[in-house]
């Protein structure tokens, strides 16, 4: 057996021992942080958005690639008057009334001076994006939440924005019918009362009769300079509910507002710290969990994080990858 074949086999065995499949194939531009994925209706092309470079984005003919970087959504930064408006984070993408919406975060690390902004385009072509500034979801030190990591979800005719990071974790706010601005006050839907409340990056997905609230838990970043204690690194968890607006519980029945959360994907084999996730319905593969992760054979720096994806099996009523 050649050395390269041995490495591949060993990696696969390690992943299977932990019960997780290895990430699916990624070709081309695969370095990402906080990916967001959508497929253009007009031609089926895939678009992937990520933190950095004022929301970098790439396109491909399939989820596997090859991915080609197009450029920045907002090359001049955001019009939101807050520190960090030239270093935009955590994009989320949706098609709303025939227009593509990219929601983004303006903040600085560890600060509650934050806001969720919006850029729109009818095509997603380079230089076609219009910045609309803040959605009205903002935070300061007087708030119980941090207004970053937005995720738009439509239930029936109503849009909701799920958001939050640390502090009191994940909140939800109803949006107006155009999904451009907040319509009423927010409320808490997930909270870990212990430790540093390390919960963020909510993403909601409906499958069957359940609404699944995916989120990232643990320490996200800076692994190359300070590695967290084993098990404290990023991982992907989930709770579910029969309503989009609350009462989410994990597989053991623990409320998501009281530290609940069933692990969907965590470190295994050469995969370390998966998180920043979303769920995408692929026309050929079905439900896909996508995320960023560290390949420990390559490096632990944030700039070295890779795009990962796995098919989701919902047959048990809970997502399994």
Curated annotation (Swiss-Prot):
The active site is at 34 (proton acceptor), 200 (proton donor). Its EC number is 3.2.1.99. Pathway: Glycan metabolism; L-arabinan degradation. The keyword Cytoplasm does not apply. It is found in: Secreted. One of its GO terms (biological process) is arabinan catabolic process. Keywords: Carbohydrate metabolism, Glycosidase, Hydrolase, Polysaccharide degradation, Secreted, Signal, Xylan degradation. The record marks 149 as: Important for catalytic activity, responsible for pKa modulation of the active site Glu and correct orientation of both the proton donor and substrate. Residues 1-19 form the signal peptide. It comes from the Eukaryota. One of its GO terms (molecular function) is arabinan endo-1,5-alpha-L-arabinosidase activity. GO terms for cellular component: extracellular region. InterPro entries: GH43_arabinanases (IPR050727), Glyco_hydro_43 (IPR006710), Glyco_hydro_43_endo_a_Ara-ase (IPR016840), Glyco_hydro_beta-prop_sf (IPR023296). Pfam families: Glyco_hydro_43. It catalyses: Endohydrolysis of (1->5)-alpha-arabinofuranosidic linkages in (1->5)-arabinans. Belongs to the glycosyl hydrolase 43 family. Endo-1,5-alpha-L-arabinanase involved in degradation of pectin. Its preferred substrate is linear 1,5-alpha-L-arabinan. This is Probable arabinan endo-1,5-alpha-L-arabinosidase A. It comes from Aspergillus fumigatus (strain ATCC MYA-4609 / CBS 101355 / FGSC A1100 / Af293) (Neosartorya fumigata).
